[in-house]
Amino acid sequence: MASRILGSIKEEVTCPICLELLTEPLSLDCGHSFCQACITANHKESMLHQGERSCPLCRLPYQSENLRPNRHLASIVERLREVMLRPEERQNVDHCARHGEKLLLFCEQDGNIICWLCERSQEHRGHNTFLVEEVAQKYREKLQVALETMRQKQQDAEKLEADVRQEQASWKIQIQNDKTNIMAEFKQLRDILDCEESNELQNLEKEEKNILKRLVQSENDMVLQTQSVRVLISDLERRLQGSVVELLQDVDGVIKRIEKVTLQKPKTFLNEKRRVFRAPDLKRMLQVLKELTEVQRYWAHVTLVPSHPSYTIISEDGRQVRYQKPIRHLLVKVQYFYGVLGSPSITSGKHYWEVDVSNKRAWTLGVCVSLKCTANQSVSGTENYQPKNGYWVIGLRNAGNYRAFQSSFEFRDFLAGSRLTLSPPLIVPLFMTICPNRVGVFLDYEARTISFFNVTSNGFLIYKFSDCHFSYPVFPYFNPMTCELPMTLCSPRS
C-alpha cells in the first residue's frame, strides 16, 4: 500500500517533459508544472515553430513573465527523494506490492518481475518465467546496447538542433542583409527622385524669374506708354480750353503726333512653348541603376603610377593626378604623351573604377595598352586616341564637348610590329543631359568590352567599346589634359 501511495505521489511531481522528478519547478497559468530547464527549452521551441508560448500539455498560451516558482512542489520533491533513499523503502520496492513477497521471478510475456504467488495466479498462468538472475545479464546487455544507441541518437539530435540553430542564425543574418540592401536601394531611389524633383523645381524657379522679369519690363513699358498718352490728352484739353491762339499754336504738329500714337500691346507668354514636365521614367531608371549596381560589384582598387617624363603630379596616396606646366628644358624632346596609367595591369576578369572629374574643362580617361612612344612634339595627342593604337577612351574638351575616340579605319595590331598610323581618329560626339562629375569605367576582359557610366546621372551609359582587341595586358588610363583641376579615383563608399 505504501509503495502504491509513493508511486502516486511520484506521478504528481514528475515533469511531463523529461519524466523525471521536478527540478526547480515552475507553474504556468493553467496550473501545470515543469522543470525550469524543460519549460525554458520548450518556450524557445514553441516560439520557433508556433510563434507563441503554449503549455506542452493543454496547449493554452502563457506569458513568460507569469511563470512562478512552485515552492510547495519543490518541498514535496525534496521529501520524496529522501523517502526513496531510505533502506526500508528500498526494501519495499523489492517486494510485491500485492502479496508482500520478494520479487524473484521475471515474466517474459509481461516483461515484468513478479513474486512466486503472482506466478501461480490466473494472470500469469502459462507464461514463461525465469529467475531474475538468469535474465538480468541478457537484458542488461540489451539495455546497454539501447543506451549506446540512444546516446548516439542524442548526439545526432544535438547536432540536428545545432544545425537548425546555425541555419536559423544564418537566415537571420541573410534576411537582415537583404533588409539592409532593400533599404539602401530604396533610399538611393528616393535620393534620385529627390534630386529629380529638386532639378525640376529649380528649372521652374528659373523660368518663373525669367518670365516675371520680362513681364516687369513689359509693365514698365506700358506705364511709360500710358504716361505719354496722358501728356497728349492734357495738351489737347489745355488747347481746347484756352484761347484761339493757344488752340492753333503748332496745331499741325500736335495732330501729327496724335496720328503717330500707336499703342504697343504688352508681351504675353501664354502662347509660348513651355517645357512640359514629365515624370521620370522610373522603369528605365531602375534598369539603369540595376546595371550600375551590377558592375559596381567588380570594384577594383586602382592606384596611379608616375610616368617619366610627365606633365602630371600624382598625390602621395596614388589616387589623384593633376596637370603640371612643363619645365622649359623638357620641352625639347617629349617621348611620352601627357597621362598616367593605373595599377595593377589587367589580363583577365571584370574590373570597375570611378573617377571624379568635377569642374574640369577637359579630361580623357579609359583604358590603354601602355604608354608607348605614341606622341611627340609634331603629333597631336588626340591622334593617338584610337583603339588601333591601344587606346579606348572618352573625354571632354572646352568644358562642354564630350566625345569618344574610335579608329579611323580597320584595326591593326600595333603591338605585332605594324607602324603606328597617326591619322586623326573618328570623333563620336556624346550628348549629356546631365554633365558627369563622376565617370564609372567597366572593363570585361573576356567579353572584350569597355563601358563608361555617368554616375552623376543615375548611372546612365555614356558609351561602350565592343569587340576590343586585348592582345596584351591593359591598364586604366587617366589624362587631366591642360586643366589644372585634379582627376581623383573614388572609393566604393565615397
Curated annotation (Swiss-Prot):
A zinc finger (RING-type) spans 15-59. Degraded in a proteasome-independent fashion in the absence of viral infection but in a proteasome-dependent fashion following exposure to restriction sensitive virus. The keyword Zinc-finger applies. It is found in: Cytoplasm; Nucleus. The B box-type zinc finger domain and the coiled-coil domain contribute to the higher and low order multimerization respectively which is essential for restriction activity. The coiled coil domain is important for higher order multimerization by promoting the initial dimerization. The B30.2/SPRY domain acts as a capsid recognition domain. Polymorphisms in this domain explain the observed species-specific differences among orthologs. Capsid-specific restriction factor that prevents infection from non-host-adapted retroviruses. Blocks viral replication early in the life cycle, after viral entry but before reverse transcription. In addition to acting as a capsid-specific restriction factor, also acts as a pattern recognition receptor that activates innate immune signaling in response to the retroviral capsid lattice. It comes from Saimiri sciureus (Common squirrel monkey). Gene3D superfamilies: 2.60.120.920, Classic Zinc Finger (3.30.160.60), Zinc/RING finger domain, C3HC4 (zinc finger) (3.30.40.10). Can form homodimers and homotrimers. In addition to lower-order dimerization, also exhibits a higher-order multimerization and both low- and high-order multimerizations are essential for its restriction activity. Interacts with BTBD1 and BTBD2. Interacts with PSMC4, PSMC5, PSMD7 and HSPA8/HSC70. Interacts (via B30.2/SPRY domain) with HSPA1A/B. Interacts with PSMC2, MAP3K7/TAK1, TAB2 and TAB3. Interacts with SQSTM1. Interacts with TRIM6 and TRIM34. Interacts with ULK1 (phosphorylated form), GABARAP, GABARAPL1, GABARAPL2, MAP1LC3A, MAP1LC3C and BECN1. It is an enzyme of class 2 (transferase). GO terms for cellular component: nucleus; P-body. The modification N-acetylalanine is found at A2. This is Tripartite motif-containing protein 5. A zinc finger (B box-type) spans 91-132.
